[in-house]
């Protein structure tokens, strides 16, 4: 049962960020297992199980990331990830763009929300076309989001793609899109309450997740 993370988890993540090499990791591998990996998997499984009960028609998969980076994509970085996460998303092809619900733990923050790792140009073009054709559903969601603790994010175009109005321009003129809540690694992070907070957040975000997920079924607009 998930009991919260601990300061030991944060200490490990700071340690691996400052000593990202095999010798240090092997000397602290048990710390990683006990304080980071096991609690992350417990949190992911319990959140996933609760959501599966709430939304039985959704076909989801839980993925808990490994700490090892892909050796083919180090790009000068160390062999270990310095922040860890789990995602809940529908099954998809390897390079298919799908949104996910996520929880992430880093040495200096924790975060949870929904969105794309990389939405891709085609997905964002579909979003703009949907806004052009029927803005009202997203207007309702945008107003609701603006009253919440969650924040819209994602790289913006230097030259706007168009003018969808003050409310929807932040959605319209992005290269990627996510909705998240960040907090300092303290307080509730170290308690079982974190699971309930993440669950409540995911339930709040479900209309946004579903809105984004259905973009895959839209026709790609003519360029």
Model-based region annotation:
Residues 69-71, 90-92, 107, 116, ...:
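Short, flexible loop/turn elements at secondary-structure junctions
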Residues 14-67:
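Active-site acidic/histidine clusters and adjacent loop/turn architecture
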Residues 105-164:
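Compact, glycine/acidic-enriched structural inserts
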Residues 52-96:
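Hydrophobic/aromatic-rich structural module bridging two neighboring secondary-structure elements via a short loop
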Residues 100:
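Structured soluble/peripheral alpha/beta segments that form catalytic or ligand/cofactor-binding pockets
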Residues 80-82, 97, 106-110, 171-173:
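A short, structural micro-pattern
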Residues 1-15, 44, 131, 136, ...:
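Long, solvent-exposed, polar/charged low-complexity segments
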Residues 29-36, 116, 126-131, 190-194:
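Short histidine-centered catalytic/ligand-binding loop motif
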């Amino acid at each position: 049962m998930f009991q919260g993370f601990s300061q030991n988890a944060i200490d490990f993540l700071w340690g691996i960020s400052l000593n990202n090499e095999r010798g240090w990791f092997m000397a602290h591998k048990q710390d990683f297992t006990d304080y980071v990996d096991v609690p992350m998997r417990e949190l992911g499984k319990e959140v996933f199980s609760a959501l599966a009960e709430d939304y039985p028609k959704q076909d989801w998969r839980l993925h808990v990331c490994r700490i090892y980076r892909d050796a083919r994509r180090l790009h000068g970085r160390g062999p270990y990830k310095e922040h860890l996460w789990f995602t809940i998303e529908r099954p998809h092809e390897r390079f298919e763009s799908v949104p996910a619900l996520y929880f992430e733990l880093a040495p200096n923050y924790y975060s949870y929300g929904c969105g794309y790792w990389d939405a891709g140009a085609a997905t964002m073009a579909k979003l703009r076309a949907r806004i052009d054709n029927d803005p009202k559903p997203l207007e309702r969601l945008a107003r609701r989001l603006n009253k919440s603790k969650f924040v819209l994010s994602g790289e913006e175009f230097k030259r706007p793609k168009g003018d969808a109005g003050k409310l929807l321009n932040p959605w319209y003129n992005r290269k990627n899109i996510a909705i998240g809540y960040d907090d300092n690694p303290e307080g509730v992070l170290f308690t079982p309450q974190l699971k309930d907070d993440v669950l409540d957040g995911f339930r709040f975000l479900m209309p946004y997740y579903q809105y984004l997920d259905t973009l895959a079924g839209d026709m790609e607009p003519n360029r």
